[in-house]
């Protein structure tokens, strides 16, 4: 039995895609840029908000200065709308409660900006479920790089010895687990298809 589970957030614990897509399209509309269907945003997300901003910005608007300005704009819009449609996946709160009752330690590890990751977890889940909630930090490479995973595991005092399971919904999560030497459970209710997890 696994003693510790590291969960991805968006597409794994929470269905956040509508709020992410709507916020991005609000930014696009404000600039007169093309907007995208929600289904397309499923492949824009996963590598962090800066990469999301780069993907929805037109090629002519991707200078470092332009992307920084668009990122700040997106953060403001998303911060105001990140709870409009977001919700836990059905059965997730009950599953987490059962794991907690069984003595399984749990943490959240997301490429979502740290402040947003903490905010949505605090909004939708009991405060004592997760020992650590960690989102993307400015000085730490995002998943699937190993630095963040190793730092999180060190904080939890665990090692890649077969007792830690990583759970996520995308190829980024599969790569994250592989790079850290962890077994991975890929969920099929999230943002990607089964073939994206192999």
Can you describe what each PLM-predicted range is?
Residues 84-87, 113-167, 171-180, 194-196:
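Substrate-recognition "cap/lid" segment bordering the active-site pocket of phosphatases
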Residues 191:
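PG/GG-rich flexible active-site loop of Rossmann-like NAD(P)H-dependent oxidoreductases
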Residues 93-101, 174-178:
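Surface-exposed amphipathic alpha-helices with a cationic face
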Residues 6-8, 109, 167:
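Generic enzyme active-site microenvironment
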Residues 188:
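Nucleotide-sugar donor-binding loop of glycosyltransferases
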């Amino acid at each position: 039995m696994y003693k510790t589970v590291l969960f991805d957030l968006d597409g794994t614990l929470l269905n956040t895609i509508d709020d992410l897509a709507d916020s991005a399209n609000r930014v696009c509309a404000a600039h007169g840029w093309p907007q995208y269907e929600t289904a397309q945003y499923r492949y824009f997300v996963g590598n962090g908000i800066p990469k999301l901003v780069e993907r929805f910005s037109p090629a002519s608007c991707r200078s470092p200065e332009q992307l920084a300005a668009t990122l700040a704009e997106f953060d403001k819009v998303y911060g105001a709308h990140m709870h409009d449609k977001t919700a836990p996946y059905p059965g997730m709160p009950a599953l987490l409660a059962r794991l907690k009752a069984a003595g399984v330690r749990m943490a959240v590890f997301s490429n979502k900006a740290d402040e947003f990751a903490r905010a949505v977890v605090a909004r939708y889940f009991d405060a004592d479920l997760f020992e650590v909630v960690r989102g993307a930090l400015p000085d730490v490479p995002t998943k699937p790089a190993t630095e963040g995973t190793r730092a999180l595991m060190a904080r939890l005092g665990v090692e890649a010895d077969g007792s830690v399971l990583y759970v996520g919904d995308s190829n980024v999560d599969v790569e994250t687990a592989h790079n850290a030497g962890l077994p991975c459970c890929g969920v099929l209710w999230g943002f990607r298809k089964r073939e994206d997890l192999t």
